[in-house]
Amino acid sequence: MLGITVFTTFLAYASSCGAPIFQPNLSARVVGGEDAIPHSWPWQISLQYLRDNTWRHTCGGTLITPNHVLTAAHCISNTLTYRVALGKNNLEVEDEAGSLYVGVDTIFVHEKWNSFLVRNDIALIKLAETVELSDTIQVACLPEEGSLLPQDYPCFVTGWGRLYTNGPIAAELQQGLQPVVDYATCSQRDWWGTTVKETMVCAGGDGVISACNGDSGGPLNCQAENGNWDVRGIVSFGSGLSCNTFKKPTVFTRVSAYIDWINQKLQL
């Protein structure tokens, strides 16, 4: 009965997901790019850990229900205490209007997460309390299970990652256009080759626009035909050479490959 209740609740707000009050600027970039319009990606969260009595940004994530956040498995350490910052634009402003800080109840890391091969890089965070949705805090939509996007489909990566290779973490949320690179292309030898699996999705690779350190766990935002935004990917890895290497697009965990796993964890 509990599972039915949770799933029914999920369907109730899913109909209004992925619809920001403040519309995003759809021509911005991440690396070497521009600030996002404040609160135009209201499902974007900052995952923060406590060290020396200070909360520090470590990864991004996506609010998918008022109680749950999607992020990357590689963002999670059993030795750290976490909180989730919601409704944020500027991480340097602690009491930013419209923002909220929530503790963590449970973290579900995928049972088959492989840190060496970077497989199944997905985790679901259950928040310690239910978040009240607002103009600055909204949920993203989940894509249809198994669905794929075509080559060059326009998507946007968002995060507070480094503005450029070895540069500083961004204070204000960044965004950038990263078109999808299909599996047939991304798995070619001079791209990512066999490193990329069908449970992943690639985007970018033009040598200019890229996710960077600190963006990990954050969403690949793709607009559906109905105008709402789906979280199609979770930032997983990129080139070790630099943040924006030609033919080395950002690699994301493909969310549509894990819908069944996500739904199972939502019921726990």
UniProtKB/Swiss-Prot annotation:
Residue ranges the record assigns to the propeptide: 17-29
UniProt xrefs under InterPro entries: Peptidase_S1_Elastase_sf, Peptidase_S1_PA, Peptidase_S1_PA_chymotrypsin, Peptidase_S1A, Trypsin_dom, TRYPSIN_HIS, TRYPSIN_SER
Q: Does the keyword Signal apply?
A: yes
The processes (GO biological process) annotated in the record are: proteolysis
**The enzyme's E.C. designation:** 3.4.21.2
Do the record's keywords include Glycoprotein? yes
Mainly localized where?
A: secreted
SMART domains (UniProt xref): Tryp_SPc
Annotated active site: H74, D121, S216
The lineage's top-level taxon is: Eukaryota
Alphabetically ordered keywords of this record: Disulfide bond, Glycoprotein, Hydrolase, Protease, Secreted, Serine protease, Signal, Zymogen
Q: Give the protein name, as stated in the record.
A: Chymotrypsin-C
Localization recorded for this chain is: Secreted, Extracellular space
- Protein family: Belongs to the peptidase S1 family. Elastase subfamily.
Per its UniProt record, what PROSITE patterns does this chain match? TRYPSIN_DOM (PS50240), TRYPSIN_HIS (PS00134), TRYPSIN_SER (PS00135)
Q: In which tissues is it expressed?
A: Pancreas.
Q: Report which gene this protein is encoded by.
A: CTRC
Q: Which reaction does it catalyse?
A: Preferential cleavage: Leu-|-Xaa, Tyr-|-Xaa, Phe-|-Xaa, Met-|-Xaa, Trp-|-Xaa, Gln-|-Xaa, Asn-|-Xaa
- Which species expresses this protein natively? Bos taurus (Bovine)
From the broadest rank down, the organism's phylogenetic lineage runs: Eukaryota, Metazoa, Chordata, Craniata, Vertebrata
Q: Which Pfam families match?
A: Trypsin
Q: What does this protein do?
A: Regulates activation and degradation of trypsinogens and procarboxypeptidases by targeting specific cleavage sites within their zymogen precursors. Has chymotrypsin-type protease activity and hypocalcemic activity.
